[in-house]
């Protein structure tokens, strides 16, 4: 386990002294439990966690890639750059969260209540850092009754 300062220090080394990148990693993506104990101190640790989880799934299929082959694709963000929720959620046993960044919801019904229901769904997703898309063509244009 590590503390926040150790995560910042190790992440700054990984990001060649970039304080902003280190801070974003530490606050959004480093594996941490509810008590504030960190289990990853740099993106390299995160890439190991992701590789382990991807391999767990891969191993269920014929000709799986090895955990190390997967890690080599992720290492240093050279070939694959997982985004947002997947980086913090995949293989994370300390919190339950969605690993999807974007959601498509039903088109709103053309009524006050229907629009409010869609708005409530949008707000619930947005407060959990998700992006939302929906088709508004079901709503009457202005001036039509």
Locations of regions flagged by a protein language model:
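Extended catalytic cores of very large enzyme megasubunits
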Residues: 1-145
């Amino acid at each position: 386990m590590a503390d926040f300062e150790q995560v910042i220090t190790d992440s700054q080394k990984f990001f060649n002294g970039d304080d902003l990148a280190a801070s974003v990693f530490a606050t959004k993506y480093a594996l941490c439990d509810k008590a504030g104990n960190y289990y990853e101190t740099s993106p390299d640790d995160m890439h190991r966690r992701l590789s382990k989880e991807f391999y767990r799934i891969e191993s269920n299929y014929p000709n799986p890639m090895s955990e190390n082959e997967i890690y080599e694709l992720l290492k240093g963000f050279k070939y694959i750059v997982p985004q947002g929720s997947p980086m913090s959620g995949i293989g994370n046993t300390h919190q339950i969260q969605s690993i999807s960044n974007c959601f498509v919801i039903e088109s709103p019904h053309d009524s006050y209540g229907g629009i409010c229901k869609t708005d409530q769904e949008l707000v619930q997703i947005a407060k959990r850092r998700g992006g939302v898309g929906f088709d508004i063509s079901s709503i009457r244009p202005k001036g039509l009754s």
